[in-house]
A protein has these predicted regions:
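Short "lid" loop at the C-terminus of a central beta-strand within the Rossmann-like core
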Residues: 98, 143-147, 172
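Conserved SAM/SAH cofactor-binding pocket of Class I
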Residues: 25-117, 125
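Conserved beta-strand signature within the Rossmann-like core of class I S-adenosyl-L-methionine
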Residues: 135-145
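Helix-to-beta-strand junctions that scaffold the AdoMet/dcAdoMet cofactor pocket
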Residues: 60, 132-134
């Protein structure tokens, strides 16, 4: 299926385990407060080929996962996977995060948002924070991370009603690649006029390279 649809560039088994499965779950397991949550609503923004959402659904069977992507063929592929793997606690949603945040059925609905993307962290925060409820979490999966990025992100996160709870820097187990996990917490409601995202501001998703 992956060769047919070209959903991920990672084809070697060990690379797949490290850069998809390990990466997906590390962001959750390294934060005990999140890992201990039960029966929560989770959204994977820009899921692509289903990461980190699919491994999350398998590892946390009492979580309800929404897999969001704007590409129909990716959603169709994931729908097939959900059926084949008999994963019943995940569903797909075809759409864009910038429009979903204006939908009252999704805004302030989720306990946890996950996002692995190459867009600027500020854009990722604008997509994710309006979707989580008070006291909810956002996990930004990043590669390299600089102190200046933290300083630039802080006021934007605050405007959206969040705060940077912590940042964890880790190494992958086999190739020693650097990963940074930015944990945001929703501490007050996002005002109705936010996020101020233009239609042309499109988040382009990819998996870690």
């Amino acid at each position: 299926g992956n060769q047919r649809l070209n959903l991920t560039r990672i084809t070697e088994p060990l690379d797949f385990v490290e850069k998809h499965l390990w990466d997906s779950l590390a962001g959750l397991l390294l934060c005990p407060t999140i890992a201990q949550l039960t029966q929560i609503q989770v959204i994977d923004i820009g899921t692509g080929a289903g990461f980190p959402g699919l491994p999350t659904a398998i590892a946390f069977p009492d979580w309800s996962i929404t897999l969001l992507d704007s590409t129909r063929k990716k959603i169709q592929f994931i729908d097939e996977l959900l059926t084949t793997l008999q994963i019943t606690n995940a569903k797909t949603w075809l759409g864009r995060a910038e429009t979903l945040s204006g939908d009252r059925c999704h805004r302030s609905y989720y306990d946890l948002a996950l996002i692995r993307a190459v867009a600027q962290p500020a854009i990722c925060a604008q997509y994710a924070l309006p979707l989580v409820k008070l006291d909810g979490w956002v996990v930004l999966y990043r590669g390299q991370w600089e102190k200046a990025e933290t300083e630039a992100l802080m006021p934007i996160v605050a405007e959206l009603g969040g705060k940077i709870e912590t940042i964890k820097t880790i190494q992958t187990p086999w190739t020693s690649g650097i990963r940074n996990l930015i944990y945001l917490r929703k501490v007050k409601s996002t005002v109705a006029t936010l996020p101020r995202l233009q239609r042309k501001t499109i988040l382009k998703f990819r998996q870690f390279s």
